Amino acid sequence: IGNVAEFAFDGTGRWLAWVVDAQGKTGNGIQLRDMETGVIQVLESDEAQYRRLAWADEEPALVALKAVEDDDFEDPLYSLLAWQGVDGQGMPDRIELDPMEEEGFPQGMTISPNRSPRWSDDMEAIFFGIHEAELKEDAGQEEETGEEEQGPEEEPEGEPEDRPSRSGSDEIDEDEEPELVIWHWKDPRLQRMQELQASRDRNFSYLSVLWVEDGEFVRLADDDVENVSPARTGPWAIGRDDSEYELMGNLDGRRYQDVYAIDMRDGSRERILERSRWSNDISPDGSHFLYYEDGHYHTYEFATGQHRNLTAEIPTSFIDTEDDHNVEDPPVRPRGWTEDGENVLLYDGWDIWRVAAAGDDFENLTVDGKDEEIRYQGIIQFDPDDEPGYDLSEPLYFRMYGEWTKKSGYALMTDGRPGPPTCSRAWGPVSAPNCLRS
């Protein structure tokens, strides 16, 4: 296969998709090969460029970006392409979003090539980025070629030896020019940080979503709330805005943000947290959002708008007393969710606790960590491509460390019931290597 710019296998390894990018754009497109039969199918062909080819995680579906040149714009204009039912049974269903033809698309903006589009886990939506499209200078504008009429040049005042030199002999050599960095005291980011993040700023795009069933386009992020994180499934997202606190955060290290619940069906948002220091993530089922405040973990339920304190009744503390940063009552970081989204796994520095997202139930899974001074530091997830969250009905491997014995190793819990995971302990006075599954 020649002129291949990108390629990607699906999760099963049966289907190979690739982008053809030939000189002169002749024959450009996206093609698909069945690795079992060798049959090749052309999904798309046009005098255009194609980028960001990607498969959905579980279903036979593709997504990509298509770029065409436009004489009125500095850069190519992109549209979104997607296919469902890529299984060799006829031509798959094709989906396209062209900003030039979409009535609800923001004026003066286009799809960004700097963010990879992706399918949602439930296959109901496609996420992608948009940014401003830069227009070329008006070709009809007449260039001014005349020069302003200038009067006779005035002789500079002062004695000849005091007058500025016209020969250029007194000019400063470029290598000796002083470097001057001007920082305004109201800039929210320090000058050095602006320099370090310049590339990120240039490539920034606003998250948007296309709902597949009705073809509805919804913009999720804007200048008021730039940082948006969608749930893996369902219609909710979390937006974060630190504009009110960014300057002081860069000066004293205490970074706060306002947090919004966003309905991705229509883009409406509601502020649910103000001046929040620690917000975490959305549950795998998209129903709850976890955050930490005033020494306790809380959840916010999207459907009801209800906040619940999860840890007020638990007989332990989740404050990290060993963290000496310039913040009050920092938390010990959570260890994740159960895969059904019904429980969050919290760590108090010794034991790992299962706490219901509804706030009505909890239990200590490892039990003896604090009493035996063993730190069950985390749960091992062998495959990073596994479903988000942990299945408590399956065997769980814990990383463990003896606070005073300095032993380290791993423990296995097989039944998901609370109790010391002693059924299979492997540890000793050594630095335990990474635990891998064959």
Region roles according to the model:
Residues 1-438:
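Beta-propeller folds
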